[in-house]
Regions:
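Conserved "right-hand" nucleotidyltransferase catalytic core of DNA-directed polymerases
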Residues: 1-9, 13-14, 22, 29, ...
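Hydrophobic "anchor" residues on beta-strands that sit immediately upstream
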Residues: 3-5, 51-52, 76, 337
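Active-site-proximal helix-loop-helix substrate-binding element of RNase H-like nuclease domains
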Residues: 14-19, 23-44, 50-144, 152-162, ...
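Metal-dependent catalytic core segments for phosphate chemistry
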Residues: 16-22, 339, 346-376
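Short active-site loop/helix that positions an aromatic residue
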Residues: 21, 58-71, 86-88, 224-231, ...
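Cytochrome P450 catalytic domain signature, combining two hallmark sequence patches
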Residues: 72-75, 189, 232-238, 354-366
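Generic long, charged, amphipathic alpha-helical segments
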Residues: 366-379, 448-456
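Short, amphipathic alpha-helical "recognition" segments used to contact nucleic acids or chromatin
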Residues: 383-393
């Protein structure tokens, strides 16, 4: 198999031209270069290559070479060292950039600041990147031993789909979004004025005068101080000893209308923050092209930014329906927006590993959450649903206890009762803990190794 390490330099991330291309034979290190107008000749040469080794090649180099250098590189031909780096250890100190890898491998990248025009320095910079990518690929081959190749194939295919999703974007009703933002900001301003009238400014005695600091409804510190002045006794603190003020804490203060006002303000803060991020990222095509990092967490879950389109409020939450209605289709006459959801994915995977006939039947034909309600001794089905997902994702006794309005001791008893009624789950949990103690990793669903940083 003919393998080549390839790197390119372009005029911009959204490239209109390729300044230079450097390719290095993976086994022998033999190097070829194309500069300026020669770059279109790369396409003919690339037809001889079976595998292209590139850093971010799926999302950047490969598509640009196909578009501007007459290449016909297929995604299956690309070995992307960026995806490998993220897959083998999603949370590396320093990240996954080629620059970071240069420091780890003691083969630092070159420095270049001007990319608009070709230069000899640019070519040498590209050569250096190609050599570094070759060293990185060799290093990752060793690191990836024991990983199921299907894990890489899965992440490669996901990256291809996500790149298409980002390019297409999601239609956004900009006008309605601006109207909703104005409405919520208006209520915010009203609450700010109301709070200023309700709470006197704080007096600060200076050397020669008294300074008056107006009450700031957005300051959690000031909120805590004013509530305590009215007799509230805080019960929750941060590790540094600061009083915790959030929507959960405020919702539990039933005898002070001020707490309800503060809670409302925090809600509006969150909603206006989301709306501003959506509006800011809406492009001229009327669509939001949100970014997705496909391998951002230790478990391989995705992360979203610019904006975070995975955090649109649920339809049943305050202003959830209004927020969700902003995400639409470009032409309602020809297209419809269809929502889908997978049913109980985590519990179906759990059933596979438990191999418990009764549990499997509850998922397929019964009501697994009602069954879990009985097993854990919970009051409601909703509590059981919240409990099982929190438990599966590592919630400890304190978090579990909070679900039912109790303490860490309550949570500990709930877990013990649930496991006593689910012996197969107790056994599975014990086996996983033993495996982690021995290896420090566990095997993922697709054969990848998941590094465990803490017991939960």
């Amino acid at each position: 198999m003919m393998k080549a390490v390839v790197d390119i330099e372009t005029d911009a991330l959204n490239a209109t031209k390729i300044h230079c291309i450097v390719a290095q034979h993976y086994q022998t290190g033999e190097t070829r270069q194309w500069i300026k107008d020669e770059c279109v000749q790369f396409g003919g040469w690339s037809g001889k290559i079976d595998q292209f080794i590139m850093h971010n090649g799926l999302s950047f180099d490969g598509p640009i070479l196909n578009r501007l250098a007459n290449a016909k590189i297929q995604p299956g031909q690309i070995r992307d060292t960026l995806i490998e780096s993220q897959l083998y250890n999603p949370v590396r100190d320093g990240g996954h950039s080629l620059e970071s890898w240069g420091e780890r491998l003691e083969y630092t990248k070159g420095e270049l600041t001007e990319f608009e025009e070709y230069s000899e320095d640019m070519l040498q910079y590209c050569v250096r990147d190609t050599e570094l990518t070759r060293k990185l690929a060799t290093n990752l081959e060793q690191e990836g031993k024991g990983f199921n190749p299907q894990a890489y194939e899965l992440e490669r295919n996901i990256r291809i789909i996500i790149d298409r999703q980002q390019a297409n974007g999601f239609a956004f009703n900009l006008m309605e979004g601006q109207i909703l933002l104005a409405k919520l900001e208006d209520e915010q301003h009203q609450l700010e004025s109301q709070a200023t009238e309700m709470f006197e400014p704080t007096e600060v005695q200076l050397k020669t005068k008294v300074k008056y600091i107006p009450f700031n409804i957005a300051s959690r510190k000031q909120i805590a101080e004013r509530l305590m002045e009215r007799g509230w006794e805080p019960k929750r603190y941060t590790d540094k000893g600061n009083i915790i003020i959030n929507e959960d804490v405020l919702s539990q203060i039933k005898d002070m209308p001020e707490a309800k006002m503060f809670n409302r303000y925090f809600l509006l803060q969150k909603r206006t923050g989301l709306l501003k991020s959506w509006i800011q990222e809406c492009q001229e095509d009327g669509r939001v092209h949100g970014k997705v990092l496909t391998l951002r967490t230790i478990t391989g879950r995705m992360a979203h930014h610019k904006p975070n389109m995975a955090q649109v409020p649920a339809v049943y939450s305050p202003y959830g329906k209004e927020c969700r209605s902003l995400w639409t289709v470009s032409n309602p006459e020809t297209h419809k927006l269809v929502g889908t959801d997978a049913s109980g994915l985590e519990l179906r995977c759990l059933a596979h590993y438990l191999n418990d006939t009764d549990f499997t039947n509850e998922i397929l034909t019964g009501d697994v959450h009602s069954a879990n309600q009985v097993a854990a001794g919970l009051r409601t089905r909703d509590q059981a649903k919240t409990f099982i997902y929190a438990f599966l994702y590592g919630a400890g006794p304190a978090k579990i206890g909070k679900i039912v309005g109790g303490s860490a001791q309550t949570g500990r008893k709930l877990i013990e009762k649930f496991l006593s009624n689910m012996p197969q789950l107790k056994k599975l949990r014990s086996n996983i803990q033993e495996a982690v103690e021995k290896k420090g990793t566990i095997k993922g669903l697709d054969g990848r190794r998941l590094q465990i940083r803490s017991e939960h």
